[in-house]
Structures are given as structure tokens and as C-alpha cells.
Amino acid sequence: MELAWHIVAAEHRFYGGIVAGVFDFAPIHQPETVGTARDIAQWYGQSFERNFRTLAELSGEQLVKVLDFRGLFRLPAVAYLNFSLHHTIHHRGQLSTYLRAMGGKVPSIYGESHDSAEAKKAAQTPT
């Protein structure tokens, strides 16, 4: 659950920083009402929708403004969209490895996973 929350909170932070023109590194605490994976997914869906609308309204000038990220990077705001994407990809990969170790089925992420291919074969096999 902590990793899932990290993914959505970090993405929200990246988008908020791009919009504001400066990153705020204050913790984004998981709301008490967000206690399950389903809750996290719902929170993400709602926040992404708002963030996407706001990002879509940014001007070219805002998107090329150079933003500092913890003194580690100084990139145009638009570059942090890609940075955020790669951050999310990295952690989704982590989540997928945890699923199998916990006995879960790994869903299709980029093309079929072994588990999704097996499920597809099983669905096509007459019983």
C-alpha cells in the first residue's frame, strides 16, 4: 500500500510543481479515507483528472520555464512530465514483482504478462 500511495502522491506532486512553477516537497499524506488499493486508485483517478485539465491549460511559456528539483535537476517544466512517467513506470514494475511473490497474478502492463497470457489461453480452451 505504501508503494501504491507513493506512486500516486509523487505523480500529483510532479504535476502540481509543473503547474505552480515550483516544487513543494511537503509530505502528501494519505487521507484517512484512502485505506485500500481501490481507494488509492479512485483518489488517483480524481486527482489525475483535475491535474490533466490544469496541465492542458498551461502556456508554452509556463512549460519551458526551468524548474529546480531539489538542487539535483534544472529542467524545463515540460521535461518533468517525462520524468514523472519514468518514475511511475519504475515503481509499477516494482509492484508487479511484488504481486507474484505474494501469490497474485501479474496483469498486462506493456503487452501480455505470463499470467494474462495463461488466463487468455484458459478462456479459449473449451471445458
Q: Where do the language-model regions lie?
A:
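Short, contiguous alpha-helical
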Residues: 1-29, 68-127
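Helix-adjacent hinge/juxtasegments
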Residues: 16-17, 21-58
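Hydrophobic small-molecule pocket/channel-lining residues, especially in calycin-type beta-barrels
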Residues: 46-49, 53, 67, 121-124
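Acidic catalytic patch
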Residues: 55-71
